[in-house]
Each structure stands twice: as structure tokens, then as C-alpha cells.
UniProtKB/Swiss-Prot annotation:
Protein's name according to its UniProt entry: Urease accessory protein UreG
Key words, A-Z: Chaperone, Cytoplasm, GTP-binding, Nickel insertion, Nucleotide-binding
Highest rank taxon of the organism: Bacteria
Transmembrane segments: none
One Pfam family from the record: cobW
UniProt xrefs under NCBIfam families: ureG
Organism: Deinococcus radiodurans (strain ATCC 13939 / DSM 20539 / JCM 16871 / CCUG 27074 / LMG 4051 / NBRC 15346 / NCIMB 9279 / VKM B-1422 / R1)
Organism ancestry: Bacteria, Thermotogati, Deinococcota, Deinococci, Deinococcales
Purpose of the protein: Facilitates the functional incorporation of the urease nickel metallocenter. This process requires GTP hydrolysis, probably effectuated by UreG.
Gene name for this UniProt entry: ureG
Length: 213
């Protein structure tokens, strides 16, 4: 069986690992799943997910890239490919595999040879102007996640402005690539990400995700 492979990218501190923890908890009873994390010199994200008991430890694998993590998910994904193959060998029924890596809006795109789809996580604390700047992560990711909406009042960010700018950047002709707003502390928006995975990627008969606010 070939699992659906979903890349999870975004800057350090944007909430990628926290999102993975939530998604694993929500999906582990529905699907046979695993996670690969990428770090430059450590296995910190692997340890965080293991300590949180997001999945059984053997289902959480860390890749130490020794350089910019985006290289290991785009230019030379061999380390990740080997880890994918190892997980498939150990878990033949694997249905869903998340591959997480840090990187900014320009660097954090995934090779189509490594993943079937990818999402990009950005942080409201970066300011309301961030979606307006565009870039590959914001424009071309299969799903844009605008995280930490609870911080908007603290940094003077207007979520309505971010929504309008994200919609403009994500528009492709008559279509708008999906994007969601999340607050992982309250769980807001998590259902929309799961709906995207199940409706858009796994083709389950579920309600499609709502776009934007």
C-alpha cells in the first residue's frame, strides 16, 4: 500500500509541530499514520511529538539534514525517501504520512517526488502584511494555514485584511486555492484542515473545507 504523503512546511515557531500533534491525535484512530520530522542538527521535533505521545514512538522518525532542511525536501530528498521506504516496510498498511520541515516562504516548498500535497503554515504574529507579500508558500501550497489567530489583537493584525490578501494571492483564475485560519489552543480551524485532507486528498464523502474566515 502506498500512503498519502503530506508535506508540512513553514518558518520556525509558526506552529508546524503543534499542528502535527493535533492532527495525529485527531486522525490516529481513523487512519494508519506516521510522521517524519526534519531538523538541521537535532531531533528536537521528533522528541517533542514523542513526549506528547502524538503517536507510538516507532511511528515518529527524525531526519537530521546537516544543512538547510529545505534541501532535504526539495533538491535532494534522498534521506526522506529512505525514511519513507523504511516506514512503509515496517508498516505495510500505512495510509497517511506527514513530512515536516522548517523553511521560510521562499524555501519551504516540497518536491513532488517526495509528497503528494503540502501545506504551508504562517504565523499571525508576523503581522497582517505577510500574506500580501506572496511567495511560493503563500501562493502555491496546496493549503495555506494562517495560525495563531488569538495573537492578532496583541500585534495589531486585522484578520479581515489577512483574509482578503490571502484570497487575492491564492486566486488562480476562477478558483481560489484553499486556506484556513487556525488557533491550535482552542482547536479553531483544525476541522477544516482535516476536511481538506479527507475531501480533497483522500476523496472521502465529507463536507469540503471552508475557505478563509
Amino acid at each position: 500500500m502506498t500512503p498519502l504523503k503530506i508535506g508540512v512546511g513553514g518558518p520556525v515557531g509558526s506552529g508546524k509541530t503543534a499542528l502535527l500533534e493535533v492532527l495525529c491525535r485527531e486522525l490516529r484512530d481513523r487512519y494508519d499514520l506516521a510522521v517524519i520530522t526534519n531538523d538541521i542538527y537535532t531531533f528536537e521535533d521528533q522528541r517533542i511529538l514523542t513526549r506528547a505521545a502524538a503517536l507510538a514512538p516507532e511511528r515518529i522518525r527524525g531526519v537530521q539534514t546537516g544543512g538547510c532542511p529545505h534541501t532535504a525536501i526539495r533538491e535532494d530528498s534522498s534521506l526522506n525517501q529512505e525514511t519513507v521506504e523504511a516506514l512503509q516496510g515496517e508498516f505495510p498498511g500505512l495510509e497517511l504520512l506527514f513530512i515536516e520541515s522548517g523553511g521560510d516562504n521562499l524555501a519551504s516548498s516540497f518536491s513532488p517526488e517526495l509528497v503528494d500535497a503540502w501545506l504551508f503554515v504562517l504565523d499571525v504574529a508576523g503581522g497582517e502584511k505577510v500574506p500580501r507579500k506572496g511567495g511560493p508558500g503563500i501562493r502555491h501550497s496546496d493549503l495555506l494555514v494562517i495560525n495563531k489567530t488569538d495573537l492578532a489583537p496583541l500585534v495589531g493584525a486585522d484578520l479581515r485584511v489577512m483574509d482578503a490578501d490571502a484570497r487575492a494571492q491564492r486566486r488562480a483564475g476562477d478558483e481560489v486555492r484553499p486556506y484556513v485560519f487556525t488557533n491550535l489552543k482552542s482547536g479553531a480551524g483544525v476541522d477544516e484542515i482535516i476536511a481538506w485532507i479527507e475531501h480533497d486528498l483522500l476523496f472521502r464523502d465529507v463536507t469540503p473545507p471552508r475557505v478563509g474566515l
